[in-house]
């Protein structure tokens, strides 16, 4: 682990996924099947990680990740390695309380027969000398991405997942991960559950971790269902107002959120007193590539509510649905925009 390394002021990072090479999976598509098999697939995934690391380093990203190149999906890529979940006989259910999806079924006690991402992290750690971040799905979002036929309680299932995630996270931290992020888009939808057991499940997942821990809560990928949903939310998006006070009292170190080109009142980030704030300064729902000044504008606004030492410019969400050149341009803007404000502060 190199978390003790000196990071610059306004250290940049990304929220999640990056586009996959066209030879690995169909581009600009969620859940795209692999184009390779066996050893060729293993090699292809590692080559893809090398590419996205180079993309991030060229853009000046300070805390890098594997861009989720080894997984087809940020939730199912983990759950498909667990026992007790049937991926063959799917069930159509409403997820995130806004669109229908064919999801796997929980048919027995969930368990993790073997580490899921240890080999991925070993390679990632060996491939860069920068601080690294690794993402895992959060317990509530896992529960919301399947159909339960065994536990009969979303809370009980979430706690079972949290225990599994904690085992995984401890192993990844020991392998040198500097930040482990739990992705919880479901926190922006099920506010009563967040209060009643969602934060508790998140706390269980991060229990005993020595590395930095983060939670990512956003308004989703730039897909049609999310775009339509966001249009229904009115002139101000105040969902964070219900979750941020709870997270401010939690043991989670960092909160990653959506700000760029959104209707989130920027002052809501002030509710995260004492936490690092990963402010989304890149809009992932458009192919327009931001300028450095666009990014700098978001950062300057955020600095009115968060101390500079606690602000980390980031992307709003993952970018796997975007073309690689668009994603590369956006990363470059993120790095340049942070550098611009950094110079203004010294």
Model-identified regions with their sequence ranges:
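Domain-level signal for soluble alpha/beta catalytic cores
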Residues: 1-346
């Amino acid at each position: 682990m190199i978390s003790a390394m000196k990071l610059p002021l306004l250290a940049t990072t990304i929220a999640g996924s990056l586009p996959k090479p066209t030879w690995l999976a169909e581009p600009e598509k969620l859940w795209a099947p692999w184009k390779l098999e066996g050893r060729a697939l293993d090699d292809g995934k590692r080559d893809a990680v090398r590419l996205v690391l180079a993309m991030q380093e060229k853009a000046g990203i300070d805390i890098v990740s594997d861009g989720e190149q080894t997984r087809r999906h940020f939730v199912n890529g983990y759950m498909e390695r667990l026992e007790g979940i049937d991926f063959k006989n799917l069930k159509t259910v409403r997820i995130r309380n806004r669109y229908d999806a064919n999801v796997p079924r929980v048919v027995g006690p969930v368990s993790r027969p073997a580490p899921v991402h240890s080999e991925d992290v070993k390679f990632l750690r060996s491939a860069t000398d920068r601080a690294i971040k690794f993402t895992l799905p959060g317990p509530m979002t896992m529960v919301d991405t399947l159909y339960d036929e065994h536990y009969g309680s979303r809370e009980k299932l979430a706690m079972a997942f949290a225990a599994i995630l904690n085992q995984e996270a401890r192993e990844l931290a020991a392998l040198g991960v500097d930040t482990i992020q739990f992705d919880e888009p479901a926190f922006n939808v099920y506010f009563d559950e967040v209060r009643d057991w969602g934060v508790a499940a998140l706390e269980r997942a991060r229990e005993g971790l020595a590395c930095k821990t983060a939670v990512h809560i956003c308004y989703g990928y730039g897909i049609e269902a999310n775009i339509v949903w966001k249009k229904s939310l009115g002139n101000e998006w105040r969902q964070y107002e219900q979750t941020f006070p709870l997270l401010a009292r939690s043991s989670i170190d960092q909160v990653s959120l959506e700000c760029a080109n959104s209707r989130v009142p920027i002052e809501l980030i002030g509710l995260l007193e004492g936490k690092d704030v990963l402010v989304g300064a890149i809009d992932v729902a458009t192919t327009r590539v931001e300028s450095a000044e666009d990014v700098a504008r978001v950062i300057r606004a955020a600095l009115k509510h968060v101390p500079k030492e606690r602000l980390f410019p980031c992307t709003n969400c993952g970018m796997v649905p975007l073309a690689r050149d668009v994603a590369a341009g956006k990363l470059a803007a993120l790095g340049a925009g942070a550098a611009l404000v950094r110079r203004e502060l010294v």
